[in-house]
Amino acid sequence: MLYILHENDQWLAPFRETFTEMGLPFSEWHMASFLPDLTVEPPLGVFYVRMSASAHTRGHSGVPELTAGVLCWLERHGRCVINGSAALDLELSKVRQYQALMAHDLPVPLTYAARSPEQLLSLARNMPCPFVTKHNRAGMGLGVERFDGFDAFEIRLDALAETPPVDGVTLLQVYIDSPESFITRCEFIGGKFVYALRVDTSDGFELCPADNCSVPDQHDSSETKILRFEIVADYVDPIIPRYENFLHEQQIDIAG
C-alpha cells in the first residue's frame, strides 16, 4: 500500500489518475484534516511525502510542522518514507537549503536573511545590484521581487511588509542575470536525474510546474502558443552528478 501525505488536492490529481491506471493501491493522508494515531504503530506500506512550503497559502498553516512530527513517528517505526523528515526540513527553509548546498561546494548567490524592515533596509544599502527579495519559507516564487537599486527597494519596503513571510524571515539575494529569459530546472527521482525543464521567466517569478504547466492541444496548430515549462530532451550538464551526490547525502529522494 502506498500512503500519500499531502495538503493540496489539485496537485495530486495526476497522481491519482496514474496510480489508478497502474492498479497501484494507495491511500491519501490529507494532512490538513487527517491525523493518524501516533500512540500506535503505523500501517505497513510506503509513505510518499508531498508536503509543500506553500501550504499556508491554501489556509494550511501549521500543517508542515504537524507533518514533520508524523514523519518522525513513521521513521521511528522503520517505515519506508519517500522524502522524509530530512527532506522536509530543507523544504521549509531556504536558509537551510543554501547552507546545505554550500556544504557540498554547490554555488549559491550571495544571500542575507532578516526579520524586520529595519534589518532589510540596512542590508539593502550595501547589496550588489540587482538583487531580489524572497520569503524564506515559500513555494511558487512567493515574495520574489527584483530591485535594480536601493532607492527602488526603499520605496517598496512598506508594500513588501504587507505580505510578510509565514516564518517571519525575508531573504535578500543577488540576482543572477541571464542572457535569455529562462531558467533550467532539473528533475530527480530516486536521487537520479530524469529530465530537465526549460522555464520561461519572462512573466515573473511566481512559477510552479503543478500550477502553470501549459500542455499543448494536439489539435492546436497555433504557432503563437507559448509553454512556460518545456521538457528539454537529452539535457547534459557537468553539475548534475554533484546534484545527485547532494541529494543522496541529504536523504532527498525526489526533487526539482
Where are the regions that the model predicts?
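Phosphate-binding site of ATP-dependent enzymes
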Residues: E145-P241, N245
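Short glycine-/acidic-enriched loop or helix-start segments at secondary-structure transitions
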Residues: P14-F15, R58-H60, S93, L142-G143, ...
